[in-house]
Amino acid sequence: MKIPFEEISRIVIEGNYASIFLISGKRYVLKTSLKRLQMKLNQELFIQSHRSTIVNLKLIGRIDLNRNKVIMKCGAELELGNKFRNSVKAAYH
């Protein structure tokens, strides 16, 4: 399956499966790892925001550092891991 990078909003890993959420609202589930996906993604467009989440930088609405959340333009609120706070904040601004 080929999905254009710019159509991916976020990727959430649950166990051995990755849920790929598209801007259109569609969701695809693949059996793969976070590391495998990171190798295929455009590193300038995507950043890891949590141990199980990768987000599209262009689709971040805002970052709430008080609540450790990444709020996507679509309204989805995702956890922001302490380990990833600084890198997400720097890449977003």
Language-model features: locations:
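Basic, polyanion-interacting recognition surfaces, primarily
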Residues: 1-93
